[in-house]
Swiss-Prot record:
Lineage: Bacteria, Bacillati, Bacillota, Clostridia, Eubacteriales
Subcellular location: Cell membrane
Top enzyme class: translocase
Protein topology in the membrane: Peripheral membrane protein
Listed name of the protein: ATP synthase subunit beta
Species this chain originates from: Desulfitobacterium hafniense (strain DSM 10664 / DCB-2)
Length: 465
């Protein structure tokens, strides 16, 4: 009774007719299997058209489909495996392993469409998540259960920063990570997989990919697949989970394609009219509960660098912190190339972080801002034209700039310097001492690529020798 037949195929959208009593619900999975043609396709019901026909979105290529083919109503949404068995593996949007390994068998599967945690289950407290990365912890700290936007062009170090976060959460907090590759390059996913294996972090993370070559249905849903796997670790294993989404813009882009295929009237700039709803349904599930938390780091591509474009603008509304990577900083050889003045965080306040942290962070930003304003004068007239106070600001700013860099564990194989995890107390103490002028006598080079302030002092001795 629950078998229907395909009546129309329009690219990635397929119409299926069922008997009136067997009509599948919205978001139900419908399977089309034709072994002799090697077709094994899953569709997701998106609309009821009337006349016992449903309109579905395909999760993989519709090549080879024909009208009249049988389609099975599974009676449930797309469900994916969850649990410890998913760690160290790569999945597609349907939860099938795509890393040429053996099939993943888990005791539990979750549907990818799930309600966000109820208000009473959410944890109202705001707690900082220590990353061990100085520039982030000091100036744009992450909150547990928060959402962080990661902005940066090609080749400024987004992936390395993501890898270091995964490494630090695994090593220092014993936490797990889920990486969702949404509509990005397959080559980048492959590189990430190989680098994760080399750095030994792969056993602490699950990876889900729906890349550029996949139909829009897969790219629209793969974020939910990754989020569902992360929810299991939060709700059942009481973990603090890191969820990486690369790239949240492609999620919106896929939604726009699906919306057009479904015949919906476009909204501003041609985006789907349901843009805010779709984004909200994904983002509201990313939160802290009384059991654990999901902290999400989302790479955000900004089309034509226009921050008012509806896609990035809708994502901004959900963010708690932004980490902006700047090419000018990476060109100076300062890594991570996080812009200390452009990056910000909602939790950078004395009520949450304490007076000392807040004051040191603001003092550091003030010195860097003054240095930025003086750079034109320095470029035209040179350092000699500055007053003594201004010269002092410049010398401290240059030390701070270098001290904001640090060697990463995951980049050890390239740099040859062992990675450093810096606790927040050490970070605050180090910058406080530089701001107060305790280390004005040390050479600038001593502050570059070190962890704590003690290491800078040791490096200065070595340079002096």
């Amino acid at each position: 009774m629950n078998i229907g037949k395909i009546v129309q195929i329009m690219g990635a959208v397929v119409d299926v007719e069922f008997a009136s009593e067997a009509l599948p619900e919205i978001y139900s999975a419908v399977k089309v299997t034709v072994p002799e043609k090697k077709i094994d396709l899953t569709l997701e019901v998106a609309q009821h058209l009337g006349n016992n026909t449903v309109r579905c979105v395909a999760m993989s290529s519709t090549d080879g489909l024909q009208r009249g083919m049988a389609a099975l109503n599974t009676g449930a949404p797309i469900t994916v495996p969850v649990g410890p068995a998913t760690l160290g593996r790569i999945f597609n949007v349907l939860g099938k392993a795509i890393d040429n390994g053996e099939e993943v068998h888990t005791d539990t599967s979750y549907p990818i469409h799930r309600p966000a945690p109820a208000f009473v289950d959410q944890d109202p407290s705001t707690v900082m998540l220590e990353t061990g990365i100085k520039v982030i912890d000091l100036l744009a700290p992450y909150s547990k259960g928060g959402k962080i936007g990661l902005f940066g062009g090609a080749g400024v170090g987004k992936t390395v920063l993501i890898q270091e976060l995964i490494n630090n959460i695994a090593m220092e907090h014993g936490g797990l990570s889920v990486f969702a590759g949404v509509g990005e390059r397959t080559r980048e996913g492959n590189d990430l997989w190989n680098e994760m294996r080399e750095s030994g972090v792969i056993d602490k993370m699950a990876m889900v990919f729906g890349q550029m070559n996949e139909p829009p249905g897969a790219r629209l849903r793969v974020g939910l697949t990754g989020l569902t796997m992360a929810e299991y670790f939060r709700d059942v294993q009481n973990q603090d989970v890191l969820l990486f989404i690369d790239n949240i813009f492609r999620f919106t882009q896929a939604g726009s394609e699906v919306s057009a295929l479904l015949g919906r009237m476009p909204s501003a700039v041609g985006y789907q009219p349901t843009l805010a709803t779709e984004m909200g349904a994904l983002q509201e599930r990313i939160t802290s509960t009384r059991n654990g938390s999901i902290t999400s780091v989302q790479a955000i591509y900004v089309p034509a660098d226009d921050l008012t474009d509806p896609a990035p603008a809708t994502a901004f509304a959900h963010l708690d912190a932004t980490t902006v990577l700047n090419r000018a900083i990476s060109e100076k050889g300062i890594y991570p190339a996080v812009d200390p003045l452009d990056s910000n965080s909602r939790i950078l306040s004395p009520q949450i972080l304490g007076e000392e942290h807040y004051k040191v962070a603001r003092d550091v930003q003030q010195i860097l801002q003054k240095y930025k304003e003086l750079q034109d004068i320095i470029a035209i007239l040179g350092m000699d034209e500055l007053s003594e106070d201004e010269k002092l600001v410049v010398s401290r700013a240059r030390r701070i700039e270098r001290f904001l860099s640090q060697p990463f564990h995951v980049a050890e194989v390239f740099t040859g310097s062992p990675g450093k995890y810096v606790p927040i107390k050490e970070t605050i103490r180090g910058f406080k001492e530089i701001v107060e002028g305790k280390h004005d006598n040390l050479p600038e080079a001593a502050f570059h690529m070190v962890g704590t302030i003690e290491e800078a002092i040791e490096k200065a001795k070595a340079l002096g020798a």
